[in-house]
């Protein structure tokens, strides 16, 4: 079996040597594109014994962020792979480390033939002296990525300006995607809140409507669910939670579904298709849905097999939308205790997942449901190391079409 590792570097001297060392542990070849680096990237590539092929752009070309668009760069790497014809390809960014707890070669050798690509967790380093515990107090720094796939002739890149997955756009023509335990990608960038804010501002200049980010707002994605103009609120919430100053939680109050196995498939806030007024949790069919807080059932709606339950308490409405199982249904006026089971989540069409759309409203409009939960001391994001794929794919996708007026 032959494994080809690939990356694209531009002034990556700070991280490149460590990235190459981590790839050399299991790969037979490492191919690299050096995109007009002016630091010591070229020297590192020339001296690293595991690097077997380098394509360099002329250094005197204009100093744009990348010489060619991301999709064209991926195509060049794919065509380089055609000259190697490996069994497996791993592609990473030049500031990613690959950490393994397994014999990766042995695992790939026994991977079923119908699995043609593999996802694994990516963890961002965090080293912010001003906000040292922002992760995990405000959210997670883990996400699934797809760095590994089988080589086939004719693989092609996605056509977006940026944020194309590393794996080929047509890889699923050859089989299905699996998940690879025991391997982690460690991202060296975005290790402080200030770096994340700068990255959000950079992406918004390039893609103000986040069309290339799968329709997901950059600030909500990188700033733990907060908008760019809510950074002061993020900092204030962090300081509150560090002090243990949480909003009151009723006896029995809990997350709407258990932490494991659970994933956030779609977050709250602006998306390319409109304003999403809640958060969508993906979980296994049959998972119970619980009332976060007590109240009375004030509305029940059913559309296309989905049930929408609204539980009202004082000036707060909490909405739960899911495809129910076969249990008995609630009726208008039912009094619900905090922590009571509202139902179970049914399967969603052809997907192996079930989904819960969770929404919180006040008289002033919708509020961020993740912030609502976390400010009571409930952490709705998955615990470290327990990521779950959504719909078995990357990027995560949910069938939710609920939108509302921007608050």
From Swiss-Prot:
Short name of any one Pfam family annotated for the protein: Peptidase_M23
- Enumerate the GO terms in the molecular function aspect: metalloendopeptidase activity
The record ties this protein, via InterPro entries, to: Cell_wall_metabolism_enzyme, Dup_hybrid_motif, Nucleotide-diphossugar_trans, Peptidase_M23
Q: Where are the transmembrane segments?
A: none
Keywords, in A-Z order: Signal
Q: Which CDD domains match?
A: M23_peptidase
Q: Which residues form a coiled coil?
A: none
Q: Which Gene3D superfamilies match?
A: Glucose Permease (Domain IIA), Spore Coat Polysaccharide Biosynthesis Protein SpsA, Chain A
Q: Which GO terms describe its cellular component?
A: peptidoglycan-based cell wall; plasma membrane
**Which residues are the signal sequence here?**
1-27
Q: Which domain of life is it from?
A: Bacteria
PANTHER family, sorted: L-ALA--D-GLU ENDOPEPTIDASE, PEPTIDASE-RELATED
Tell me what this protein is called. Uncharacterized protein Rv3786c
**Species of the source:** Mycobacterium tuberculosis (strain ATCC 25618 / H37Rv)
């Amino acid at each position: 079996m032959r494994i080809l590792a690939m990356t694209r570097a531009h002034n990556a001297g700070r991280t490149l040597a460590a990235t190459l060392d981590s790839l050399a542990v299991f790969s037979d070849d490492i191919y690299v594109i050096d995109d007009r680096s002016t630091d010591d990237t070229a020297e590192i590539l020339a001296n690293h014994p595991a690097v077997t092929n380098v394509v360099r752009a002329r250094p005197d070309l204009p100093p744009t962020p990348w010489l060619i668009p991301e999709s064209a760069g991926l195509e060049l790497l794919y065509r380089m792979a055609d000259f190697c014809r490996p069994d497996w390809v791993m592609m990473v960014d030049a500031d990613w480390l690959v950490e393994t707890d397994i014999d990766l070669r042995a695992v790939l050798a026994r991977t079923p033939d119908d699995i043609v690509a593999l996802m694994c967790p990516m963890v961002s380093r965090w080293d912010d002296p001003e906000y040292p515990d922002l992760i995990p107090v405000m959210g997670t720094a883990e996400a699934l990525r797809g760095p590994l796939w089988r080589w086939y002739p004719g693989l092609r890149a996605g056509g977006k300006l940026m944020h194309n997955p590393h794996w080929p756009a047509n890889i699923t023509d050859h089989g299905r995607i699996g998940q690879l335990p025991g391997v982690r990608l460690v991202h060296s960038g975005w290790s402080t809140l200030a770096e994340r804010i700068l990255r959000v501002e950079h992406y918004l200049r390039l893609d103000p409507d986040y069309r290339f980010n799968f329709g997901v707002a950059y600030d909500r994605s990188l700033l733990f669910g907060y908008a760019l103009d809510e950074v002061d609120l993020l900092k204030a919430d962090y300081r509150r939670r560090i002090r243990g100053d949480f909003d009151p939680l009723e006896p029995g109050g809990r997350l709407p579904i258990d932490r494991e196995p659970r994933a956030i498939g779609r977050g709250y806030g602006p998306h390319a298709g409109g304003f999403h007024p809640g958060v969508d949790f993906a979980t296994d069919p049959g998972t119970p849905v619980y009332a976060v807080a007590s109240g009375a059932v004030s509305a029940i709606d059913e559309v296309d097999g989905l049930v929408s339950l609204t539980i009202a308490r004082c000036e707060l409405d909490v909405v739960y939308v899911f495809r129910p199982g076969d249990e008995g249904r609630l009726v208008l006026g039912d009094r619900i205790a905090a922590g009571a089971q509202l139902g179970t989540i049914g399967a969603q069409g052809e997907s192996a997942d079930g989904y819960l759309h969770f929404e919180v409203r006040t008289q002033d409009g919708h509020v961020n449901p993740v912030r609502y939960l976390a400010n009571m001391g409930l952490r709705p994001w998955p615990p470290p190391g327990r990521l779950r794929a959504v719909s078995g794919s990357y990027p995560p996708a949910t069938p939710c079409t609920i939108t509302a007026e921007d608050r």
